[in-house]
Swiss-Prot record:
GO terms for biological process: bacterial-type flagellum-dependent cell motility. It holds the Pfam family FlgI. Assembles around the rod to form the L-ring and probably protects the motor/basal body from shearing forces during rotation. Keywords: Bacterial flagellum, Periplasm, Signal. Belongs to the FlgI family. This is Flagellar P-ring protein.
Length: 363
């Protein structure tokens, strides 16, 4: 069986020159980022698909107390239309109080489905413990589940997770370092010394010498005006400057679970000879029942018959010549009929032998 490689190769794989990209496409402004919010709440109005756990009852009782309704200590409410949930959202930079956020609601307990439910007012907090938004509204759930009387069950997608578009109102904004200090710092999404230097050079070519300087393989510091309005137009100019990213380092990335192999253009192989054989062992179990005659005083016995077969496939040896490229590597492994798991073993062996020039990453 020939190997079918799923090769996700970047533009470099076809030996094309690197294309210039805008700074906004390859870097972020330091401090300008999303902030994660999370809360704990109740979803009500479920059509019998909620939960009856102790902490659900406790949360429900606490909510009633907040409304001035006190239940007896020994009273356990029988609720099947309520579920405790985790609510989370991402709060973008510069968002202001009164604006809205999309929220995701996920069941924390044994609720069968959140379909048809409504989230009650839930405080969304940041990592500092402060409340930044309040969420409430009807859930949109794409999944569903149905149970039959005979115990059969049908589940489509994930019925215990839903979303509320514009379901949270921002109550507090988050300060960013954008409007303070004498500098703006860009952080590359993919660290590379050459790209950082090229970015600084491109900015200096437009704004003048010594306006930008690379701090390391990730960060480029740029002198910026103090006035906020000038800083906005200044950044609008910077983020549209085009930079030609440096070539990626030679890498081979293998997903051992799916068999996906990603090979960069710069991967080279030194001379090496490879052969890979496979031993297959098959064990088949057959069960036989020996039933005695009805008039005989015997017992029913169950016996097992095992059949074991072993076979070893023959593989041809192939050789990598100096400077073997990606295309030649793919053709070679296809020629010997290697499976994805075999390719992983071959690549690991080549790396250990020093014949693979590139970083081997297994995910």
């Amino acid at each position: 069986m020939k190997l079918k490689l799923i090769l996700a190769v970047a533009m470099l794989a076809f030996s094309l020159p690197s294309q210039a990209e805008r700074i906004k496409d390859i870097a972020n402004v330091q401090g300008v980022r999303n902030n994660q919010l999370i809360g704990y709440g109740l979803v009500v109005g479920l059509p019998g698909t909620g939960e009856k756990t102790r902490y659900t009852e406790q949360t429900f009782t606490t909510m009633l107390k907040n409304f001035g309704i006190n239940l007896p200590d020994n009273f356990r409410p029988k609720i099947k239309n309520v579920a405790v949930v985790a609510v989370h959202a991402d709060m973008p930079a510069f968002i202001k109080p009164g604006q809205e956020l999309d929220v995701t609601v996920s069941s924390l307990g044994e609720a069968k489905s959140l379909r048809g439910g409504t989230l009650l007012q839930t405080f969304l907090k940041g990592v500092d413990g402060n409340v930044y938004a309040i969420a409430q509204g009807s859930l949109v759930v794409s999944g569903f589940s149905a149970d039959g009387l005979d115990g059969s069950k049908v589940i489509q997608n994930t019925p215990t997770v839903g979303r509320i578009p514009n379901g949270a109102i921002v109550e507090r904004s988050v300060a960013t370092p954008f409007s303070t200090g004498d500098y703006l710092t860009f952080n590359l999404r993919r660290s590379d010394f050459s790209t950082a230097q090229r970015m600084a050079d491109a900015i200096n070519d437009l704004l003048g010498p010594d306006m930008a300087r690379p701090l390391d393989a990730t960060s480029v510091q740029v002198s910026a005006p103090r006035d906020v309005s000038q800083r906005v137009s200044f950044l609008a100019t910077l983020e549209n400057i085009e930079v030609e990213p440096a070539d990626e380092s030679a890498k081979v990335i293998v997903n051992s679970r799916t068999g996906t192999i990603v090979v960069g253009q710069n991967v080279k192989l030194l001379p090496a000879a490879v052969t890979h054989g496979g031993l297959t062992v098959t064990i088949a179990e057959a069960t036989q029942v020996s039933q005695p005659n009805a008039l005989a005083n015997g017992q029913t016995t169950v016996t097992s018959n095992s059949t074991i077969n072993a076979s070893e496939s023959n593989r041809r040896m192939f050789m990598f010549n100096p400077g073997t490229t990606l295309d030649e590597l793919v053709r070679a492994v296809n020629l010997v009929g290697a499976a994805p798991s075999d390719v992983l073993a071959i690549l690991e062996a080549l790396k250990v032998a020093g014949a693979l020039h590139g970083e081997l990453i297994i995910i």
